[in-house]
């Protein structure tokens, strides 16, 4: 130990008399093994200089006794002898020991409690010789076993020279107070090989692996001098081995070199330990490990005391979200050095543009393979400080610099320069322009010219135990020589201006629990070789003015070096920043215990990386395979991680940081409640839906108290009103006014309110659809052909519909929706789109027939209708009571109708395209695109209103709450017939059309509910397929009695409603796809939307201004937009396209071209068959033929195609897209409008 005294048993009891034999006894094998396990003592070779008159060696005298005064005198004078103990470290092969027995383990544990930790991972711990003997008096059962190993041999000095003997620090020795001189004894060191008694005793060499030259026993150690090289061997030495030429009376605990690295508390402790004489009290080398020497980069460098402390306060090893910032050493306009942010990572890399100093677009970081190898070598040889307990940047920088000195990366004279460089001011692109513009990659010559012509006085405020440089460094160390104004250069000072220029928008994109990583790289002229340090703090701390946003810092990486080497510091900084942004690597960085764990994580990163050959890439098409190859590597990487998690789980333990992942997505997660799962009991699914959904009824009302719900009501109101007006006008045309806009608005309002209050999924929007419009027209033609009352027949169809719905729900038949694949959905949507397009041009053809283009129009008698039309050609006359024919042969009517139809279509279509453009902001584009239909209707109505001398047919809307044709019907439809009795056979035969309309309602409602209930949409309150189908079917029977149209769940409007109530996460990395935070599931918005649609009946005067040609344009828009999201239409275009221009889609790359075209032709054949049926008198049967496509897909197609091909051609892989620049609902859905 430092004073070289044996502690008495009990700590304060008198020291016993120690008998030291003059002859060296033979060592038994057991004694040699114990000495080898306990370590070699650190011999001091120059202790003989302190002895003026050594006693004569008497071989006949067996032993002598030492008193307490001898020990006290030796303890006092031994403090002023400088012996660098780092030159006596054990060799490398002695550092690895065999597993000790329980007794040896106990002694080694006591010994480690008296030893300070090494400063870095690469430095082995200092082991003191005789350390185990310090505890021999504490265990009585060990005295006999340790007695032989504690003997000391005395060798006679050469004649004619002063005695030069060695003693072991902490060995048994004594001094006689009356002697003029004092003999020094040394404990023999057991050698590894065969032992020779005549061979000189060799001590342990340097701790550095590169210099382990053995020291001769009598060699004189070199005293420390300012000009000597201050390396690891001279740094790691106890205070008792420091030279002091002032004599024993000078009260100096240590030299300046060690004092400048220690705090005041450590210096006071050293003074009390080394200079105060407390008799009977044994003091150790260092009471507690120094902060500088207690590097966290080594597992074995922690004493048991620290291990117990860390066990009480374990650092947080749970992985957090990451924010990485790269700062480079730059020069501002005044040629002053500062740290400048050049890139940042949340998930993807964002670089600062050179000229404009603004952030570029996020992109995947591309790294050079050489920079990764250099980074691996840097971490392997640099400093690694893990779980560093510091809370300020000056404290962290001080320990980083000291560790660099200890690990021989920088010289001691560069301490102040490196420290001041680390504490320079940090500037960011969002800050004020006080930092000025800077060159992105300044040349090394310019940096060296500036850094070589400046001078700085290092000074910074004290931080706890970190000494002030002005007090402890003496003369100021030059950082930039020859600069008298360097004292005013800004440094990083705590409590300054704080985070200037914070980007609140960026802060919103960073997760709340994120911890930052700061990367500092740059060139400096005063270093001869690169110096690096990887730091992980024990807990995240908020460092003022370092980051552009106030995010706590957990990791730091420092890389400084000269400019004359070939290392690209910018690329090396990008490499470590990209690694820290990688999910698996930063998890490994949190859990790493030493640098080997970091190196292993780099190897894992390299295993999942892609190396692109150094060849020119002419276009993006040449890089198509890179994305697919990367996805394959990521899949294998996830499989390896999953395998590791499973192995650790089976082994009975979990790796650090894996507990949360298993809790969230592990095998122990609760199974999900499948609403389509059959219970086996009658109405079992309906009961489950009621129990699942109705308990959330109070929250369905509370969750509506948000401003987002108000905005959704206004938006969906126009989205629901536009189809109601469009389909109402077309329905009035098909049914000759028996049902029109009034009936459809009332039906939408009543059924919407009831469904929102009672439905299991209140986010569904019920409304009229294209398939129901086709069925209503087919059923009307059927009734006309059979001379039946259309409205009375609908009453009996509605009653049978209720019966069939009850039977289907009671048998839990909703599970059949699983068998409806995209094969059937695409056929259904494609057919309805074709019908919409055909009906649009057919209506336009009728307009041109009634109002042909003539070379001459007669002046008189041009109007064949009512006289009122002559007075107001384009006015809004009240609807006729009887139904006279409208005017015919009107000039310019056909052309104006064509203009209105195409104008409405083009405006709505291009506003939809504008939604996905780059103009304006994302929210503004989305609002404009979503309101495209109302905007186009409004503009074309204004155009028609401004042309007063041209006739156009207007929408027929009654005044007030009235039916469309009061002279034809009333609000209540008698089931037995109004004009004549309804035939009884038709009452029974109505079951057939009821079954057909059930097929349409079932497909649209259940598929819509299935789309809304996708896992990706994050609906938490559940759905109810049985309850929703029962409500819509039962309300359909009610609609028949009042002559209202049947409704179903409208797919596009329902998805739009859910998207409007979806709350997206703001903490999304730039460039990453948006993620759903929550969906406001409630019932109030549906009730308000339906109520507002019902109140629109009072706008009859406004609705009567809408020309039918405008509705034809909306009809055309619905048909065209529905085709854009269907895969069938895309594959249809591929038939006319060469194979080399086919897109990179699974149905192209995984299926042969001719087999893909065969699948497309089968779908086209089904569509043609349905079109033929729809065009004949048997048009009512088209829903039944549509249902037959389900068994066709399940039974016939597997015989023609392989499962792999069907998976590519008929897979439901569409996910909701919430990106502001993404596609709209029409592109995501395979269902008709």
From Swiss-Prot:
InterPro entries named in the record: Anion_exchange (IPR001717), Anion_exchange_3 (IPR002979), Anion_exchange_CS (IPR018241), Band3_cytoplasmic_dom (IPR013769), HCO3_transpt-like_TM_dom (IPR011531), HCO3_transpt_euk (IPR003020), PTrfase/Anion_transptr (IPR016152)
Lipid attachment locations (S-palmitoyl cysteine): 1166
Keywords: Anion exchange, Antiport, Cell membrane, Glycoprotein, Ion transport, Lipoprotein, Membrane, Methylation, Palmitate, Phosphoprotein, Transmembrane, Transmembrane helix, Transport
GO molecular function: chloride:bicarbonate antiporter activity
Biased composition (Basic residues): 74-97, 104-113
Glycosylation sites: 874
Main location: membrane
Listed Pro residues bias regions: 1-11
Region (Membrane (anion exchange)): 710-1233
Region listing for Disordered, in residue ranges: 1-320, 431-500
Compositionally biased region (Low complexity): 201-216, 437-450
Bilayer topology annotation: Multi-pass membrane protein
Side Cytoplasmic, residues: 1-709, 912-926
Compositionally biased residues, Basic and acidic residues: 58-73, 268-290, 482-500
GO BP term, pick one: regulation of cardiac muscle cell action potential
Transmembrane segments: 710-732, 738-775, 795-817, 827-848, 894-911, 927-947, 981-1003, 1029-1050, 1084-1129, 1156-1192
Record's compositionally biased regions (Acidic residues): 137-153
Compartments reported by the entry: Cell membrane
Positions of modified residues (Phosphoserine): 168, 171, 176, 199
Family label: Belongs to the anion exchanger (TC 2.A.31) family.
Function field: Sodium-independent anion exchanger which mediates the electroneutral exchange of chloride for bicarbonate ions across the cell membrane. May be involved in the regulation of intracellular pH, and the modulation of cardiac action potential.
Protein's name according to its UniProt entry: Anion exchange protein 3
Organism per entry: Oryctolagus cuniculus (Rabbit)
Gene: SLC4A3
């Amino acid at each position: 130990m430092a004073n070289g005294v044996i502690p008495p048993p009990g700590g304060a009891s008198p020291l016993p008399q120690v008998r030291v034999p003059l002859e060296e006894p033979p060592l038994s094998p057991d004694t040699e093994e114990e000495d080898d396990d306990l370590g070699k003592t650190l011999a001091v070779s120059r202790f003989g200089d302190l002895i003026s008159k050594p006693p004569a060696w008497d071989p006949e005298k067996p032993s002598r006794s030492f008193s307490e005064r001898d020990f006290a005198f030796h303890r006092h004078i031994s403090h002023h002898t400088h012996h660098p103990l780092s030159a006596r470290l054990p060799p490398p092969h002695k550092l690895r020991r065999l597993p000790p027995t329980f007794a040896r383990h106990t002694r080694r544990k006591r010994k480690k409690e008296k030893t300070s930790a090494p400063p870095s991972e690469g430095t082995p711990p200092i082991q003191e010789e005789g350390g185990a003997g310090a505890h021999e008096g504490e265990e009585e059962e060990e005295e006999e076993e340790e007695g032989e190993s504690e003997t000391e041999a005395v060798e006679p000095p050469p004649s004619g020279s002063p005695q030069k003997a060695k003693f072991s620090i902490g060995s048994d020795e004594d001094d006689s107070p009356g002697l003029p001189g004092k003999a020094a004894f040394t404990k023999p060191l057991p050698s590894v090989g065969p032992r020779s008694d005549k061979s000189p005793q060799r001590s342990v060499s340097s701790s550095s692996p590169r210099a382990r030259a053995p020291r001769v026993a009598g060699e004189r150690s070199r005293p420390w001098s300012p000009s000597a090289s201050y390396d690891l061997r001279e740094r790691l030495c106890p205070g008792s081995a420091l030279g002091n030429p002032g004599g024993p009376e000078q009260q100096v605990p240590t030299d300046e070199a060690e004092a400048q690295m220690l705090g005041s508390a450590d210096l006071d402790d050293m003074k009390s330990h080394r200079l105060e004489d407390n008799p009977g009290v044994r003091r150790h080398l260092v009471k507690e490990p120094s902060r500088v020497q207690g590097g966290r980069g080594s597992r074995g460098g922690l004493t048991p005391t620290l291990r117990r402390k860390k066990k009480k306060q374990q650092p947080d090893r749970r992985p957090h979200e990451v924010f990485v910032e790269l700062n480079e050493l730059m020069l501002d306009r005044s040629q002053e050095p500062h740290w400048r942010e050049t890139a940042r990572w949340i998930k993807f890399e964002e670089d600062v543009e050179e000229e404009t100093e603004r952030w570029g677009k996020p992109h995947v970081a591309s790294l050079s393979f050489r920079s990764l190898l250099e980074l691996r070598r840097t971490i392997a040889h640099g400093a690694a400080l893990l779980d560093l307990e510091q809370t300020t940047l000056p404290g962290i920088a001080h320990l980083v610099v000291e560790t660099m000195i200890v690990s021989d990366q920088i010289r001691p004279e560069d301490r102040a320069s490196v420290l001041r460089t680390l504490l320079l001011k940090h500037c960011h692109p969002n800050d004020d322009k006080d930092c000025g513009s800077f060159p992105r990659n300044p040349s090394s010559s310019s940096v060296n010219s500036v850094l070589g012509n400046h001078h700085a006085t290092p000074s910074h405020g004290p931080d706890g135990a970190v000494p002030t440089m002005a007090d402890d460094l003496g003369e100021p160390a030059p950082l930039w020589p020859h600069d008298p104004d360097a004292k005013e250069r800004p440094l990083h000072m705590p409590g300054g201006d704080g985070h200037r220029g914070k980007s609140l928008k960026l802060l919103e994109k960073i997760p709340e629990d994120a911890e930052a990583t700061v990367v500092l790289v740059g060139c400096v002229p005063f270093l001869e070789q690169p110096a690096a340090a990887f730091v992980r703090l024990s807990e995240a701390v908020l460092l003022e003015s370092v980051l552009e946003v106030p995010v706590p810092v957990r990791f730091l990486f420092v890389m400084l070096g000269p400019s004359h080497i070939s290392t690209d510091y910018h690329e090396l900084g990008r490499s470590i920043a990209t690694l820290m942004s990688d999910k698996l690597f930063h998890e490994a960085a949190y859990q790493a215990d030493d640098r080997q764990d970091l190196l292993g994580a780099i190897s894992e990163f390299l295993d999942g990386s892609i190396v692109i050959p150094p060849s020119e890439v002419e276009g993006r098409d040449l890089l198509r395979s890179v994305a697919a190859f990367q996805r394959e590597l990521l899949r294998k990487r996830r499989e390896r991680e999953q395998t590791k998690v499973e192995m650790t789980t089976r082994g009975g333990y979990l790796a650090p940081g894996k507990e949360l992942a298993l809790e969230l997505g592990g095998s122990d997660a609760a199974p999900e409640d499948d609403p389509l799962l059959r219970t086996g009991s009658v109405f079992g699914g309906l009961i489950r839906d009621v129990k699942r959904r109705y308990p959330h009824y109070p929250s369905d009302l509370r969750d509506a108290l948000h401003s987002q719900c108000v905005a959704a009501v206004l938006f969906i109101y126009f989205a629901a009103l536009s189809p109601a007006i469009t389909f109402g006008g077309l329905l009035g045309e098909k049914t000759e006014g028996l049902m029109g806009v009034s009936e459809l608005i009332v039906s939408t309002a009543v059924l919407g309110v009831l469904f929102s209050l009672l439905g299991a999924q209140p986010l569904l929007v019920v409304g009229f659809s294209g398939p129901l419009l086709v069925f209503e027209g087919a059923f009307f033609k059927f009734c006309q052909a059979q001379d039946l009352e259309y409205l009375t027949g609908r009453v009996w169809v509605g009653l049978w519909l209720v019966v069939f719905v009850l039977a289907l729900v009671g048998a839990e038949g909703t599970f059949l929706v699983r068998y409806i694949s995209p094969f059937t959905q695409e056929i259904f949507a494609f057919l309805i789109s074709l019908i919409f397009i055909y009906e649009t041009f057919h209506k336009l053809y009728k307009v041109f027939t009634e109002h042909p283009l003539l070379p001459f129009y007669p002046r008189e008698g041009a109007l064949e209708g009512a006289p009122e039309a002559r007075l107001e050609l384009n006015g809004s006359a009240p609807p006729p009571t009887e139904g006279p024919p409208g005017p015919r042969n009107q000039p310019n009517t056909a052309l104006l109708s064509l203009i209105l139809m195409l104008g409405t279509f083009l405006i709505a279509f291009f506003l939809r395209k504008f939604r996905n453009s780059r103009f304006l902001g994302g929210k503004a584009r989305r609002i404009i695109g979503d309101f495209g239909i109302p905007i186009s209707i409004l503009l074309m109505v204004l155009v028609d209103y401004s042309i007063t001398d041209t006739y156009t047919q207007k929408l027929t809307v009654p005044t007030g709450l009235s039916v469309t044709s009061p002279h034809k019907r009333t609000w209540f439809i008698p089931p037995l017939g109004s004009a004549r009795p309804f035939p009884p056979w038709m009452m029974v035969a109505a079951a057939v059309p009821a079954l057909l309309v059930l097929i349409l309602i079932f497909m649209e409602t259940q598929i819509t509910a299935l789309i809304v209930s996708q896992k990706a949409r994050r609906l938490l309150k559940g759905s109810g397929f049985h309850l929703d189908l029962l409500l819509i079917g039962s309300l359909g029977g009610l609609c028949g009695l009042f002559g209202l149209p049947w409704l179903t769940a409208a797919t596009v409007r329902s998805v739009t409603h859910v998207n409007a109530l979806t709350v997206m996460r703001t903490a999304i990395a730039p460039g990453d796809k948006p993620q759903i935070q929550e969906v406001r599931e409630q019932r109030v918005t549906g009730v308000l939307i339906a109520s507002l649609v019902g109140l629109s009946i009072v706008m009859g005067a406004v609705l009567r201004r809408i020309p039918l040609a405008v509705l034809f344009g909306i009809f055309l828009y619905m048909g065209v937009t529905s085709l854009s999201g269907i895969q069938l239409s895309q594959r249809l275009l591929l038939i006319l396209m060469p194979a080399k221009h086919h897109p990179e889609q699974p149905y192209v790359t995984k299926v042969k071209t001719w087999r893909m075209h065969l699948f497309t032709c089968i779908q086209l054949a089904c569509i043609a068959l349905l079109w033929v049926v729809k065009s004949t008198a048997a048009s009512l049967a088209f829903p039944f033929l549509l249902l037959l496509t389900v068994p066709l897909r399940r039974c016939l197609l597997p015989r023609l195609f392989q499962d792999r091909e069907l998976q590519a051609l008929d897979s439901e892989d569409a996910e909701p897209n919430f990106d502001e620049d993404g596609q709209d609902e029409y592109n995501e859905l395979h269902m008709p409008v």
